[in-house]
Design a protein with these regions (language model features):
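Pepsin/retropepsin-fold aspartyl endopeptidases
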Residues: 19-171
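Bacterial N-terminal signal peptides
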Residues: 5-15
């Protein structure tokens, strides 16, 4: 009986390791491409954040064939890039220091609009939910949280950065 239990335990551990090796290892910083406009941006892969967040300005709702969309601008060093994406709702995000003027941070939330976007990391493409935010004061215009990392079956190595090669225009 002990032999069977030991065998099953070892087999389970080995099987788990085999599945873990199928995951892609990314650095904590990578270049990601928003395929709607073929815009490649530096992105921070953050296992502490739940959702993806993109620096966007001039956000306005529009209606296309009876469906809700958002038009917005992503500022880049080369100029503004305009997007029109399907609006999927809003999300409440816990406020960070300096995000809400004149309020204390304890239990403060910011409501942000969410859109679906096609994102490419390396050779993989997924449609992800992205909340639109003013990320001007952050170093990276795109933050990819756990939901996106799970969608890409990703592992993040905090010792690495910019491990992927892109052939798409970087602005």
């Amino acid at each position: 009986m002990r032999v069977c239990v030991t065998f099953l335990l070892v087999w389970t551990l080995c099987l788990g390791q085999a599945f873990a090796h199928n995951k892609r290892v990314y650095g904590y910083l990578e270049e990601a491409t928003l395929l709607e406009q073929h815009l490649t941006l530096p992105a921070k892969l953050d296992t502490g954040a739940k959702s993806a967040s993109l620096y966007a300005k001039h956000i306005r709702p529009i209606d296309i064939h009876g469906k809700p969309y958002l038009q917005f601008v992503v500022p880049t060093k080369a100029g503004d890039v305009h997007f029109t994406c399907v609006y999927v709702g809003d999300v409440d995000i816990k406020a960070r220091s300096g995000e809400i003027a004149g309020t204390r941070l304890k239990n403060s939330f910011i409501r942000r609009p969410v859109v679906n976007m096609s994102l490419q990391l390396g050779g993989d493409i997924r449609t992800i939910r992205v909340n639109l935010a003013n990320r001007r004061r952050f170093l990276y215009p795109l933050l990819l949280g756990r939901e996106t990392l799970v969608a890409f079956d990703a592992l993040v190595d905090p010792k690495q950065k910019f491990t992927l090669k892109h052939a798409v225009n970087r602005l």
